[in-house]
Structures are given as structure tokens and as C-alpha cells.
């Protein structure tokens, strides 16, 4: 595994002149961010040794490098999901490669169904914490000390300073933001009404099929993380909607400009560690 990470990182480094310290995983709701990047390099996943390839509609597969406002960033266009059949090592492989390349801060986004009755479709939720309900764990198996500790501390999975900064940006621009706990499940089925009730009762506010494995590996590697969900459907008791992938994409597209604005401002304003 270490050899594969190094191989991928060396290939990417050979193609990129000025390696950034900040990376963004362009999940649902953030695809438009790429239009704000002054692109200097683009590398398709298919060209990178050992890299998996995304199979999901709406997730194209390439690494993009360039300037977002005043900051150099790496953007991952197209992520890998456990439900696609990848094992956890492959789902999180790009995050390992990011760390090898010197990335210190990771920004992630996703689409989520909300169980919290105060949330509305189109809301943006800052992820303050998560509940991991995936059936496998990205750190299961042999631990390599050079990648991170055997038993990582998860008391602050999402950076409090970045959360505070994002809330300030929203307040200054009169943008409605909610915050809450993201429940990560394997998918690919959307949730049943009973599952929504269960997730809410155990402390979840929104649920989705990504993000948690990447965040675990990023924190294991010592990266600072900020995450945001766009609420694309409701699983509130008595209001469970009939949801489809198309509906999710439609709701995400509507919320995209606001999420893009917040992420762009946040990435430009935060101090790199």
C-alpha cells in the first residue's frame, strides 16, 4: 500500500509545478466550484497509477490544480463510493495520496437526506460531527506508523476554527446555514422511514453515502477537515419523500451557487496551518 501511495504521488508531483496545501473533494453541490478555479493542470484519474475510476453519474474523474481566488488548490472531481464495490482502502486512497503530496487541509461536500425536522430542502448543513455506520472501517488491518497512529483521536473530526469561520461568512452575507451530525451509511438504497427515525434517535441530523471514510483517513493523517452537506430530501417523521438520484441532483444544483460561494470565501480566508 505504501508503495502504491508513493507511486501515485510521484506521478502527480511530476505533472504539477506548484503543489498546493489545500484540497477540495467536489462532491454533490460543489461541482460548480471548478468554474472559479484558474486551472493550471488537469490529470484524469485513468492516467494516475493505482487510482480507482468513478462510476457515478455526475461525478467525472480528474484531479484539477490551480488558483481559487488567492489560494492554490487541488480539486478532486469525482469521488469513490463504497457502494460502487470498492474496498475502503480504494475509497480513501486519494486522501492518502493527498497527504503524501503535502496537503494539510481538506474540504468536502455531499448530498444528504435530513431527519432534523427544522431543516428544509436546499439547506446547507455544516457538518459538526459524524456517526459512522459503514460496515467496514478504512483503518482496519495493518497500521503504518508513517501514515498515522494505530488509534487516532476523533474528538474533533471537523475543525472548530473552520466551522466558526464559515458561520461568520454566512452571517456577514445573510445566508441561512444549519449545522448538525452527518450519518454515514453504505447505500446505495435511500433510507426507509424506520431507518430515518432510527438515525434521528441516535443523534443524526442528516444521512448520506460518502464523506465519513475520507474524513477518518484525513484525520488519521493529521489533516484539518471542513465538511458541508446540501439537504436534498427530507426523512422527517410523517414527511418522508419519494426520492430519486435525479431529484437529489436537482436539489443540489439549486443550492450549488451558495455552497460554492461559502467554500470559495472560506478557502480564501482561512490561514493555512
List where the protein language model places each region:
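Generic non-transmembrane alpha-helical segments
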Residues: 11, 15, 161, 165-176, ...
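Zn-dependent metallopeptidase/amidohydrolase metal-coordination segment
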Residues: 209-247
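Metal-dependent peptidase/peptidase-like ectodomains
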Residues: 143-182
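Active-site/ligand-binding-proximal alpha/beta "capping" segment
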Residues: 169-205
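Non-catalytic positions within long, well-ordered alpha-helices that form the structural scaffold/packing
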Residues: 99-102, 200, 219
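His/Asp/Glu-rich mid-to-C-terminal helical/loop segments that flank catalytic regions of hydrolases
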Residues: 236-273
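Short acidic/polar active-site loop segments enriched in Thr and Asp
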Residues: 104-105, 205, 224
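Metabolite-binding pocket within alpha/beta catalytic cores that recognizes anionic/polar moieties
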Residues: 1-154
Amino acid at each position: 500500500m505504501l508503495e502504491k501511495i508513493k507511486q501515485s504521488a510521484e506521478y502527480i508531483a511530476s505533472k504539477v509545478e506548484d503543489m498546493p496545501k489545500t484540497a477540495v473533494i467536489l462532491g454533490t453541490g460543489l461541482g460548480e466550484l471548478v468554474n472559479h478555479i484558474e486551472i493550471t493542470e488537469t490529470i484524469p484519474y485513468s492516467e494516475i497509477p493505482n487510482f480507482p475510476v468513478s462510476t457515478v453519474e455526475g461525478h467525472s474523474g480528474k484531479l484539477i490544480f490551480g488558483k481559487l481566488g488567492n489560494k492554490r488548490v487541488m480539486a478532486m472531481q469525482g469521488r469513490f463510493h463504497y457502494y460502487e464495490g470498492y474496498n475502503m482502502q480504494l475509497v480513501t486512497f486519494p486522501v492518502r495520496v493527498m497527504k503524501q503530496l503535502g496537503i494539510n487541509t481538506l474540504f468536502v461536500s455531499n448530498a444528504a437526506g435530513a431527519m432534523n425536522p427544522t431543516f428544509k430542502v436546499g439547506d446547507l448543513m455544516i457538518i459538526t460531527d459524524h456517526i459512522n455506520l459503514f460496515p467496514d472501517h478504512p483503518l482496519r488491518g495493518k497500521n503504518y506508523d508513517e501514515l498515522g497512529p494505530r488509534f487516532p483521536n476523533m474528538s474533533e473530526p471537523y475543525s472548530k476554527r473552520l466551522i466558526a469561520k464559515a458561520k461568520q461568512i454566512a452571517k456577514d452575507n445573510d445566508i441561512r446555514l444549519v449545522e448538525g451530525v452527518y450519518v454515514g451509511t453504505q447505500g446505495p438504497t435511500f433510507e426507509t422511514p424506520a431507518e430515518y427515525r432510527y438515525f434521528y434517535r441516535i443523534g443524526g441530523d442528516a444521512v448520506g453515502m460518502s464523506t465519513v471514510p475520507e474524513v477518518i483517513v484525513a484525520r488519521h493523517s493529521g489533516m484539518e477537515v471542513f465538511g458541508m452537506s446540501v439537504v436534498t430530501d427530507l426523512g422527517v417523521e410523517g414527511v418522508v419523500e419519494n426520492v430519486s438520484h435525479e431529484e437529489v441532483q436537482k436539489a443540489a444544483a439549486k443550492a450549488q451557487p451558495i455552497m460554492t460561494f461559502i467554500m470559495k470565501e472560506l478557502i480564501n480566508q482561512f490561514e493555512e496551518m
